[in-house]
């Protein structure tokens, strides 16, 4: 006795629908993961820019004899948040080796800049390298911001490609 061909084709269709549903579910989870990764990158780019701009303001004010210990502490917190993530600042940690290496360089250079600011307090700005050090720091900040933008663009491109399949 042969099996009912109608039942057999219905079973194949049901199996195909089930397989497609599983594939779709996997793609949706993948897309949600990409969206989650993109959501925090705008704040990272913004804070990298804040580090750059606020540091230049600190240098200008310090040179004019107005100590900025509070803003220096802010920059330390921003750099720490950019490197490791921060719930307080709502910053995610970018899982990007180039960005993380640049943030380590930025942190190290900010420590040198703070030492030079201390020298400004002691001997005056004309007797220090505060301007060239702050210019190098500005350049490192530009690089870090560019790396964060590139990371964000890669994530957005991946999401766009995935959306085409869904």
Locate each region found by the language model:
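Short, Lys/Arg-rich, polar N-terminal cytosolic tail immediately upstream
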Residues: 1-7
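An N-terminus-focused feature that recognizes amino-terminal "leader" regions
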Residues: 12-17, 29, 41-44, 48, ...
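Heptad-repeat alpha-helical coiled-coil/4-helix-bundle sensor or tether segments in soluble regions
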Residues: 72-136, 140-147
